[in-house]
């Protein structure tokens, strides 16, 4: 039984792994952005 390939060319297992890594990457960038905004807010608050 060979693995059926999807339109993306990934197997289900590969797609699951990619999705996990992608989600972790997005979360990492979001945390960096939140920390950066907090630091800038501490330096020069906006919307007073």
UniProtKB/Swiss-Prot annotation:
Keywords: Antenna complex, Bacteriochlorophyll, Cell inner membrane, Cell membrane, Chlorophyll, Chromophore, Light-harvesting polypeptide, Magnesium, Membrane, Metal-binding, Transmembrane, Transmembrane helix. It comes from the Bacteria. InterPro entries: Antenna_a/b, Antenna_beta_CS, Antenna_beta_dom_sf, LHB-1/5, Light-harvesting_complex. GO terms for molecular function: bacteriochlorophyll binding; electron transporter, transferring electrons within the cyclic electron transport pathway of photosynthesis activity; metal ion binding. One of its GO terms (biological process) is photosynthesis, light reaction. A bacteriochlorophyll binds at residue 37. The chain crosses the membrane at residues 21-43. Residues 44-48 are periplasmic. Residues 1-20 are cytoplasmic. Belongs to the antenna complex beta subunit family. The core complex is formed by different alpha and beta chains, binding bacteriochlorophyll molecules, and arranged most probably in tetrameric structures disposed around the reaction center. The non-pigmented gamma chains may constitute additional components. Antenna complexes are light-harvesting systems, which transfer the excitation energy to the reaction centers. This is Light-harvesting polypeptide B-885 beta-2 chain. It comes from Rhodocyclus tenuis (Rhodospirillum tenue). The lineage of its organism: Bacteria, Pseudomonadati, Pseudomonadota, Betaproteobacteria, Rhodocyclales.
């Amino acid at each position: 039984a060979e693995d059926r390939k999807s339109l993306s060319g990934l197997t289900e297992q590969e797609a699951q792994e990619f999705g996990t890594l992608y989600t972790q990457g997005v979360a990492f960038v979001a945390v960096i952005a939140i920390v950066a905004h907090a630091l800038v807010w501490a330096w020069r608050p906006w919307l007073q």
